[in-house]
A protein has these predicted regions:
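Cleavable N-terminal signal peptides of Sec/SRP-targeted secreted and luminal proteins
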Residues: 2-21
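Alpha/beta-hydrolase-fold enzymes
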Residues: 16-20, 156-160, 169-310
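Alpha/beta-hydrolase active-site loop
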Residues: 132-157
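Catalytic active-site module of serine/aspartate enzymes centered on a nucleophile-bearing elbow/loop
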Residues: 354-395
Length: 395
């Protein structure tokens, strides 16, 4: 079952037809602008920023070639991708279907984030990707360093508060970052797709098995620090989870839940870009969330927690610290086995504000970014939310 691979917690673009040879295909990565945006006829510029801990990240700024001049240009919008994805996920379908293009066509100043470790953000001032120290990070670092630096940079360049859009892990990062006043004060509003701050009700069969089998500890024992699904070693390791244990014939559903509107005919094309690498530490942190039912910083164990945090347990990210005045919009689905409805409801109960909600019973985790009908089902509502915020915006 060499097809399994794109599985692990990913929420990407796989179906039962995917094979190992497909997954191991080389990526055409030059730059996101050159690969995906310019060929569609859109304006795109590459930007580079450096985080406080030395990672070199790529940002892209995208504009429509024919903006609707009857509409006032909207404020800048930052799109933050999910786990094992990069900014390319917002442009993988046609301009009429992809959120990055759709927002640009509505006159928004579109910025695209790519976290450390992805093939667009594979640099560091002193470390190489072959150094284990390069991979010593989890989603809390993506929130506190990567996302915080992106928001600061866009805020400075655009001279405006920004609209923040996150999907999956991008929402985990957003929730954590928005508990920090210095980040929240630069954000006009947030739109979160498949919002996650808690994961203890995950029911995806393959994810449950990986947690039970302690896959995170297995890869550490193998001396691995990077999760790269284009490597033979990881393909074989993840493949073994299905052998004789469970039915993995529909890999995407076993990870994310059933997706109603995913375009399976484009898998070959998607796999030219996805999946992107992440770190073993990041996977371990996500597994900690599932096991402990917490939204907390990375748990190093009793002694190192004391040395790192000054307490025996890692500090929680308090959703109550997100400003009640920050407008939020959330889209979630009844078929999503990662952003489970029970966990979403817990998140809502702890937020000081009352976000606007879009619930789609038939939508799974991937539908919110790759559904062929997402423009009508999801994106038009998000854009209405953003435009309503402009009435009180200083932009």
């Amino acid at each position: 079952m060499k097809r399994l691979l794109v599985a692990v917690l990913t929420a990407l673009t796989i179906s039962s037809a995917v094979t190992q040879s497909h997954i191991l295909r080389g990526s055409p990565v030059n730059s996101l602008c050159a690969d995906l945006v310019h060929p569609a006829g859109y304006s795109c510029t590459e930007h580079t920023i450096q985080t406080k801990d030395g990672y070199i990240l790529a940002l892209q700024r995208v504009a429509s070639p024919t903006p609707n001049l009857t509409l006032q240009y909207g404020p800048p919008v930052l799109l933050q991708h999910g786990l094992f994805m990069a900014g390319d996920v917002w442009f993988l379908d046609s301009p009429k279907e992809s959120l990055g293009f759709v927002l640009a066509d509505h006159g928004f100043d579109v910025w695209v984030g790519n976290v450390r470790g992805t093939r667009y953000s594979y640099g560091h001032v002193t470390l190489s990707e072959t150094d284990k120290e390069f991979w010593d990070w989890s989603w809390q670092d993506l929130a506190m360093y990567d996302l915080a630096e992106m928001v600061q940079y866009i805020y400075s360049v655009a001279n405006s508060k920004i609209f923040l859009v996150g999907h999956s892990q991008g929402t985990i990062m957003s929730f954590a970052a928005l508990t920090q006043p210095r980040v929240a004060e630069m954000v006009e509003a947030a739109a979160l797709l498949c919002p996650i701050s808690y994961l203890d009700h995950v029911t995806a069969p393959l994810v449950e098995r990986m947690v039970f089998m302690h896959l995170d500890q297995m890869v550490v024992a193998l001396g691995m620090h990077q999760i790269n699904f284009r490597s033979d070693t990881l393909v074989k390791l993840v493949d073994s989870l299905c052998e004789g244990h469970m039915d993995c014939t529909d890999f995407l559903s076993s990870i994310t839940g059933k997706n109603c509107c995913f375009n399976a005919s484009r898998i070959e094309y998607y796999l030219d870009y996805e999946p992107h690498p992440s770190s073993v530490k990041n996977l371990r942190h996500l597994f900690q969330m599932i096991r402990k039912g917490s939204f907390a910083q990375y748990d190093y164990g009793f002694l190192k927690n004391i040395l790192t945090y000054g307490t025996s347990k890692p500090p929680e990210f308090e959703l109550g610290h997100i400003p009640a005045s920050l407008p939020m919009w959330m889209g979630y689905g009844g078929s999503d086995l990662l952003a489970d409805v029970i966990d979403v409801e817990r998140t809502l109960s702890e937020l000081p504000s009352r976000p606007e909600l879009l619930y789609l019973e038939n939508y799974g985790h991937i539908d919110f970014v790759l559904s062929t009908s997402a423009k009508e089902d999801v994106y038009k509502h998000m854009i209405q939310f953003f435009r309503a915020r402009k009435k009180s915006s200083s932009w």
